Amino acid sequence: MAEEPIRLTQYSHGAGUGCKISPKVLGTILHSELEKFYDPNLLVGNETADDAAVYDLGNGTAIISTTDFFMPIVDDPFDFGRIAATNAISDIFAMGGKPIMGIAILGFPTNVLPAEVAQKIVDGGRFACHQAGIALAGGHSIDSPEPIFGLAVTGVIDTEKVKRNASAKSGCKLYMTKPLGIGILTTAEKKGKLKPEHQGLATAAMCQMNSIGSQFSQVDGVTAMTDVTGFGLLGHLIEICEGSNLSAVVFSDKIKTLDGVKDYIAQGCVPGGTGRNFESYGHKVGALTEEQKAILCDPQTSGGLLVAVEPNSVQTIIEIAKDTGIDLYEVGKLKPKSESDIVVEVK
């Protein structure tokens, strides 16, 4: 009798970027009464919830540093490692940089799962690093109750090309590089409701590198970028708005989703992270239908880039996306800060 295949998602209480601590709770954790340490060379710290830290070397080049890790969102160990690494590397691309090195972070229940499973996870991470043109240069591991994997990633960028999430301008159009719905499809799979024709769609999206961010950083009209991950499209857009002192409008009819997403919402395949996200920032968002909430607050794992671009540079980024095979689509626009508490309106 054949052995049952190991299903990694059965060994974790959370999944992918849905494991993130909610924005509301995270704000409490990060609050500190200690005097802030000031370093004039630290161009980007944690003040605006940006994707990575950026340090000016003083010679026209800056170092980008980030880390990201989570528990399994798929059952296959190799795919889990690949997705986790792709997601971590994305933070470098979201700042407009070029990754140069990855360091692995591994937590593994050695008394529950065989070491060969961990080997496949790390190999998946190594594969993603090679796709990004970097080495998996080392790492650290611990024995933990649940599988955890991710990377610490170092990148470089011309100092003047850094794309912060707090440098957007009013009038910019907003574009996305991947469809939404990753959290919904992976939840449907975990519940055993995913149809055969939708198998692998979420994995393919999560494994798509956001390397186009390095090219977007060369476009002066691109004023801000971030990758859409655990806080959903609305959460990460709110970070851009609050960091840049702006408001935004999202065009719900232009949002692209993975196939089957709306049907799975109707079947109740909405991850727990969606509710936690809305609880954290729902008061900053205009009226939403339940379906809009499920899509726009859906926690993405290794999601796409959200790009703020001035109208006169829109055609440039469309051409870049076309040349690299990325299905770029408009999702909204930025406008002057509203006098009300509503940061993002959904139309």
Swiss-Prot record:
Cofactor binding notes: Binds 1 Mg(2+) ion per monomer.
Reactions the enzyme catalyzes: hydrogenselenide + ATP + H2O = selenophosphate + AMP + phosphate + 2 H(+)
Keywords: ATP-binding, Kinase, Magnesium, Metal-binding, Nucleotide-binding, Selenium, Selenocysteine, Transferase
Chain sites annotated for binding ATP: K20, T48, A49, D50, D68, D91, G139, H140, S141
Positions of the record's site feature: Important for catalytic activity: K20
Entry-linked Pfam families: AIRS (PF00586), AIRS_C (PF02769)
The enzyme's E.C. designation: 2.7.9.3
Domain of life: Bacteria
InterPro entries associated with the record: PurM-like_C_dom (IPR010918), PurM-like_C_sf (IPR036676), PurM-like_N (IPR016188), PurM-like_N_sf (IPR036921), SelD_I (IPR023061), SPS/SelD (IPR004536)
PANTHER family per the UniProt record, alphabetical: INACTIVE SELENIDE, WATER DIKINASE-LIKE PROTEIN-RELATED, SELENIDE, WATER DIKINASE
UniProt xrefs under HAMAP family: SelD
Record's protein name: Selenide, water dikinase
